[in-house]
């Protein structure tokens, strides 16, 4: 699997191969296109096609040399309609100076000069030839070279340089874009030599779920050591089991702080008699009229 068609200076290190394998860049799909057969390593028993990692590294270095040959970095346009590649293309553009189109590609961006999103790049790089087919189609109209991350079942029509890799996983997409950016910076001289490690981690290119990021932010903002005392403490800000702080109204006795059942009389009848005293019904006190009709 080691690349044999490269100069010795471009040979992959053991760390590079281990990273490609750890990110599952070698795991393809169960379908295999005719144009992707030269990049096939073998087919597993479950029908999954395995990509040759050596071929992947060869195409990464080839694509990096093509990108570095363009004088103006902004003449390179990186595109990703797939969500897993949008963060990667934005980081690639930030590190290399390219233009990024993350999300939906506006039709006519390469062909209709009246639109505000019109661009004239000298090279485009797409994450998936199937999801970014509109960009590849328009590039073919205006003779723009295309570099694409291709899986075993990806269409390669109008694709000039295909980088064989798993273009459906978040880790594999991010790692290939990270390696591509690192090789471009090495060729431009931004990274002094090949022995100098790049201070940017591959994790920066990986897709992150916005909901997971929001949950992590909430967890970080929580004050450690603060314990809640129940729903009353949460709603009012006061402890649930404290003493009575409210003064009794004028003319009424203060409420007892003990159990309410202790203050109740033994029976209802005795309590009612003690509370009301002698009967004060108006029917009993009114004089009776004895005169008849």
Curated annotation (Swiss-Prot):
Composition bias type Low complexity, residue spans: 247-256
Keyword Ubl conjugation: no
Sequence segments annotated as region (Disordered): 239-293
Keywords assigned by UniProt, alphabetized: Cytoplasm, Ribonucleoprotein, Ribosomal protein
GO molecular function: structural constituent of ribosome
Biological process according to GO: ribosomal small subunit assembly; translation
GO cellular component, one term: cytosolic small ribosomal subunit
Location, primary (coarse class): cytoplasm
Pfam family, one: Ribosomal_S2
Gene3D superfamilies attached to this UniProt entry: Glucose-6-phosphate isomerase like protein, domain 1 (3.40.50.10490)
Cysteine pairs bridged by disulfides in the record: none
Subcellular location field: Cytoplasm
InterPro entries linked: Ribosomal_uS2 (IPR001865), Ribosomal_uS2_CS (IPR018130), Ribosomal_uS2_euk (IPR027498), Ribosomal_uS2_euk/arc (IPR005707), Ribosomal_uS2_flav_dom_sf (IPR023591)
Quaternary structure (record): Component of the small ribosomal subunit. Mature ribosomes consist of a small (40S) and a large (60S) subunit. The 40S subunit contains about 33 different proteins and 1 molecule of RNA (18S). The 60S subunit contains about 49 different proteins and 3 molecules of RNA (25S, 5.8S and 5S). Interacts with RPS21.
Family label: Belongs to the universal ribosomal protein uS2 family.
Described purpose of this protein according to its UniProt entry: Required for the assembly and/or stability of the 40S ribosomal subunit. Required for the processing of the 20S rRNA-precursor to mature 18S rRNA in a late step of the maturation of 40S ribosomal subunits.
Protein name (database record): Small ribosomal subunit protein uS2
Organism: Chaetomium globosum (strain ATCC 6205 / CBS 148.51 / DSM 1962 / NBRC 6347 / NRRL 1970) (Soil fungus)
Record gene name: RPS0
């Amino acid at each position: 699997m080691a690349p044999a068609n490269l100069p010795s200076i471009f040979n992959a290190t053991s760390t590079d191969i281990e990273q490609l394998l750890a990110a599952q860049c070698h795991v393809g799909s169960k379908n295999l296109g005719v144009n992707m057969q030269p990049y096939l390593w073998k087919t597993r028993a479950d029908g999954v096609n395995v990509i040759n990692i050596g071929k992947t590294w060869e195409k990464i270095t080839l694509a990096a040399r093509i990108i570095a040959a363009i004088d103006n970095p902004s003449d390179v346009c990186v595109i990703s309609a797939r969500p897993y590649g949008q963060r990667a293309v934005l980081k690639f553009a930030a590190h290399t100076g390219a233009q990024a189109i993350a999300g939906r590609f506006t039709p006519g961006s390469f062909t209709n000069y009246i639109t505000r999103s019109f661009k004239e790049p000298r090279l485009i790089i797409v994450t998936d030839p199937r999801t970014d087919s509109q960009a590849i189609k328009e590039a073919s109209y205006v003779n723009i070279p295309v570099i694409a991350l291709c899986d075993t079942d990806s269409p390669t029509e109008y694709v000039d340089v295909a980088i064989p890799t798993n273009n459906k996983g978040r880790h594999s997409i991010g790692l290939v874009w990270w390696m591509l950016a690192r090789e471009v910076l090495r060729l431009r001289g931004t990274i002094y030599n090949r022995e100098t490690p790049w201070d940017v981690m591959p994790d920066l290119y990986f897709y992150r779920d916005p909901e997971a990021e929001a949950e992590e932010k909430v967890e970080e903002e929580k004050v450690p050591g603060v314990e809640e005392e129940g729903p009353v403490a949460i709603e009012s800000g006061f402890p649930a089991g404290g003493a009575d702080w409210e003064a009794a109204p004028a003319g009424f006795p203060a409420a007892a702080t003990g159990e309410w059942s202790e203050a109740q009389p033994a029976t209802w009848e005795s309590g009612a008699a003690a509370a009301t005293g002698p009967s004060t019904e108006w029917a009993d006190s009114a004089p009776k009229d004895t005169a008849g009709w």
